[in-house]
A protein has these predicted regions:
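N-terminal intrinsically disordered, cationic/polar leader segments
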Residues: 1-257
Length: 257
């Protein structure tokens, strides 16, 4: 049998290294270990490695092979092992894996206690650079925000809206997804719920009215709570308020340190 040419392993003469090359948008079923146990989801993966200047291409099929051979659930330690395995399989010195997935949490309505699910967007990332591993967690948490100015100047009522608070953090050890959700939901004007009956709707309306927050208040309060956690080395907090009285959003961001 004739030998099949391995073009990607040939020499490239342009003397241009590539920071990240690999696969993006790879969708696979995955089990995530969380504080409540284990949750099955569908993940969207981006897997990349650094490519030296002299190598023409990476081995794209090896990324897929690595994930198809993956066994067990994903958590902080498993992602670190997987990132290391990727570098070995691709013969690379640096690489990154990002896993984005919907995360569901069961919540009880504040008055009736009716149970429902609420979804959150989560991304776990592991990166090895210069021999050092770094883990990051990103969670997008929807909350209600009610405008303090609108409340102050109005004879009755105040404009309120849904807000997305995005926390991206780098930690020295595992931080549970639920911990970040709890932390952020405590800082909103009110939490969101998948299902509410009339007594619950009355409660959340009045609760938000009693806890008005500007977008600036939101990011400052969340950042203050994150700074108190010794496991967290650095973080970014973003809040986007989808203004109910405008056709644009209010936005704020804090980076620490």
């Amino acid at each position: 049998m004739d030998t099949i040419a391995d073009v990607q392993s040939s020499v490239d003469k342009r003397n241009m290294p590539i920071n990240q090359v690999g696969v993006k948008g790879l969708r696979l079923p995955l089990s995530i270990i969380c504080a409540a146990g284990e949750q099955h989801t569908v993940a969207d993966l981006t897997m990349t490695v650094a490519l030296p200047a002299e190598q023409k291409g990476t081995h794209m099929s090896r990324f897929i092979e690595l994930m198809l051979a993956q066994q067990g659930s994903m958590d902080f330690a498993a992602l670190q092992r997987l990132t290391g395995d990727m570098l070995l399989k691709l013969q690379a010195t640096a690489g990154r894996i990002s896993i984005r997935f919907p995360f569901f949490r069961r919540k009880l309505a504040p008055v009736t206690g009716i149970s429902s699910l609420l979804d959150y967007e989560v991304m776990l990332s592991g990166e090895i650079l210069a021999g050092v591993y770094q883990h990051s967690l990103q969670v997008v948490i929807p909350v209600t925000s009610l405008c303090p100015c609108s409340k102050e100047i109005s004879a009755y009522g105040a404009h309120n809206q849904r807000s997305h608070v995005t926390v991206t953090l780098i930690s020295t050890e595992a931080v549970a997804i639920e911990e970040i959700i709890d932390l952020v939901e405590l800082q909103g004007s009110c939490q969101l719920y998948g299902l509410l009956k009339r007594p619950d709707e009355k409660y959340v309306t009045e609760y938000a009215y009693d806890n008005p927050k500007f977008v600036e208040d939101m990011v400052r309060d969340v950042a203050t709570a994150l700074k108190a956690d010794v496991r967290i080395q650095s973080f970014t907090v973003e809040s986007e308020n989808f203004e109910s009285i405008h056709n644009h959003s209010a936005y704020a961001l804090i980076q620490y340190p």
